[in-house]
A protein has these predicted regions:
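N-terminal Rossmann-like dinucleotide-binding module
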Residues: 1-43
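Short, surface-exposed acidic-centric catalytic microdomains
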Residues: 29-68
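Conserved acidic residues
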Residues: 33, 83, 104
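Glycine/small-residue-rich loop that forms an oxyanion/phosphate-binding "nest" at active or ligand-binding sites
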Residues: 67-77
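Glycine-rich phosphate-binding loop signature in dinucleotide/nucleotide-binding domains
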Residues: 77-83
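Donor/substrate-binding cores of folate-linked one-carbon enzymes
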Residues: 88-192
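Conserved small/polar residues in nucleotide/adenosyl-binding loops
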Residues: 195-197
Length: 197
């Protein structure tokens, strides 16, 4: 059974998609055992509590620098015997030592079709603002492995979503979450859990 940690920084809608998929039996060989939040008071922790999943706050603000935070996070996840780390709206940077410690065990969902609108500065609404400014007709989401290059790891799954006339960054963000992120993130976790058997 794949021991899964989900890392969050906000409301946890992608976490909820994973919880729902697990409850529906769609993650056959995996279990979310812990949710780690990079700041206190985020709604994702309430979602974890409601699902009976341990929630831990490891606040980035409590650590002097990225290296200290990354080391604390690495130690916590090793203590929890984590097999797969899912970054689900985790807005905190970690260092290269962390990504190497969990090589091919960290995945991220990015709200665009990589290699478009990815890398440094492309997160949250910034991604959708850039897509609309560029005039693309299709955007979407990508689940990829995490390595030392921001949004540069191997792609696992992608799903395209049409950009509609009159879209705002907020409407495009919502459509991509509903039609792509909430679908392909659980699919990717399921695939990786089956490979883990």
């Amino acid at each position: 059974m794949l021991n899964i940690a989900v890392l969050v920084s906000g409301g946890g809608t992608n976490l909820q998609a994973l919880i729902d998929a697990e409850k529906a039996g769609k993650i056959e060989n995996g279990k979310i055992s812990v949710v780690v939040a990079s700041k206190p008071g985020v709604y994702a922790l309430e979602r974890a509590k409601n699902a009976g999943i341990e929630g831990i706050v490891l606040a980035r603000s409590d650590y002097e620098n990225v290296d200290a935070y990354s080391e604390a996070l690495e130690n916590l996840l090793k203590e929890k015997h984590t097999d797969l780390i899912v970054l689900a709206g985790f807005m905190t940077i970690t260092n290269e030592k962390f990504t190497k410690a969990f090589e091919n065990k960290i995945i991220n969902v990015h709200p665009a079709l990589i290699p478009s609108f990815c890398g440094k500065g492309y997160y949250g609404l910034h991604v959708h603002e850039a897509a609309l400014a560029r005039g693309v007709k299709v955007s979407g989401a990508t689940v990829h492995f995490v390595n030392e290059v921001c949004d540069g790891g191997p792609i696992i799954l992608q799903k395209a979503v049409p950009v509609e006339q009159g879209d705002t960054p907020e409407t495009l963000q919502r459509r991509i979450m509903e039609q792509a992120e909430w679908k392909i993130l659980p699919q990717a976790v399921s695939l990786l859990s089956l490979i883990h058997i």
